[in-house]
Amino acid sequence: MYKEPFQPTYEYALECDKHDELKDFQTEFYKKEGTIYLDGNSLGLLSKRAEKSLLTLLDSWKEYGIDGWTEGEHPWFFLSEKLGKLTAPLIGALPEETIVTGSTTTNIHQVIATFYEPKGIRTKILADELTFPSDIYALQSQIRLKGLDPEEHLVRVKSRDGRTLSEEDIIHAMEDDIALILLPSVLYRSGQILDMKRLTTEAHKRGIHIGFDLCHSIGSIPHHFKDWDVDFAVWCNYKYLNAGPGSVAGLYVNSKHFNRLPGLSGWFSSRKDKQFDMEHTLTAADHAGAYQIGTPHVLSTAPLIGSLEIFKDAGIERLREKSLHITRYMLNLIGHELKDFEFTIGNPLEDEKRGGHIYLEHAEAARICKALKANGVIPDFRAPNGVRLAPVALYNTYEEVWKSVQILKKIMKNEEYKQFENKREVVA
């Protein structure tokens, strides 16, 4: 259990760390001495188990050559399916509904190509104006491939406050001309969690297929897709799942849709026992593996093996419990220590609506992020005025949160941020 009630003292932070049930996992990760890493919502840290699994697959290449496809501890030919089964509990899906493949964007193209079937008056895709740009680019592209104009056929739900979305507004936008819906599970700026169960129920009442981009939720919050009856989902594995930069992504398709041919078919869409028959007629796999396209990127998949072992040991419910407590602690500390420095908290305060990161707004956000980095705290900046801070349950401590807020207070009090330009770097 985590210590209550909140106190702003250093001793309280240490006491919370003492009671942290997950504290032993911190030694699993490579943490740079003198640095407080609060950017795990953008790129998770390397774990020793992820490193080991990568080296294991390199060794299998060295040892077996071409036979690595069927030999060794993790035969490559079945690796995507194996990791899909290990990922399934994190989203509350059946093992056969989940596959590790592609990138987030290519997987969006896959699910949209599969589920977007404009007919009659149902020709539009519903998204939102706060979603990640890549999702919009892919949706626009898929609409154009149908010979339609994205300006007419892509509907984006407006935000009332520029930070969050109203679920009532989303439901109101589910009109008779909507053919498909793609929404974020957690908004990448504000960290707002959308009620996926409610939105799925409302979409299905209207005969609309609905899916979610889980990039900012998977590995951070529990999901219950089998209960919620979500149609499809996509995600990356390099944020909270700590599988490394450019790691292979994930895709979920509800088993009730396994009769659908993939919109984008390829070499690995095939049933395994038929693949090397080399026929020109595809016999698609009868599980989520059908929605793969090309050969698995084995070395970019490898770190996920070790990372998912950690998640199995830690448990997503325990991770969520700590995440809620440590983010609430950080919000309380920010409110206590930074009230004189014109910060606005941009994420929901309610536990059930808040994901795994804190979102602060400030007119000097870009230069504040640079000053934090210069002081050994790693945040990230999101245009136009956002500072994201992610105390990750697996490897961040309450002491680190306390120190980072004190450093931020010092930066503001001494105006250290003024020595930096208030514009983002090439990579924010």
Curated annotation (Swiss-Prot):
SUPFAM superfamilies noted in UniProt: PLP-dependent transferases
Cofactors named for this entry: pyridoxal 5'-phosphate
Gene Ontology MF term list: kynureninase activity; pyridoxal phosphate binding
GO cellular component: cytoplasm
EC number: 3.7.1.3
Positions annotated to bind pyridoxal 5'-phosphate: T104, T105, F132, P133, S134, D135, D213, H216, Y238, W267, T295
Catalysis performed (reactions): L-kynurenine + H2O = anthranilate + L-alanine + H(+); 3-hydroxy-L-kynurenine + H2O = 3-hydroxyanthranilate + L-alanine + H(+)
SUBUNIT field: Homodimer.
Task performed by this protein: Catalyzes the cleavage of L-kynurenine (L-Kyn) and L-3-hydroxykynurenine (L-3OHKyn) into anthranilic acid (AA) and 3-hydroxyanthranilic acid (3-OHAA), respectively.
UniProt protein name: Kynureninase
Gene responsible for this protein: kynU
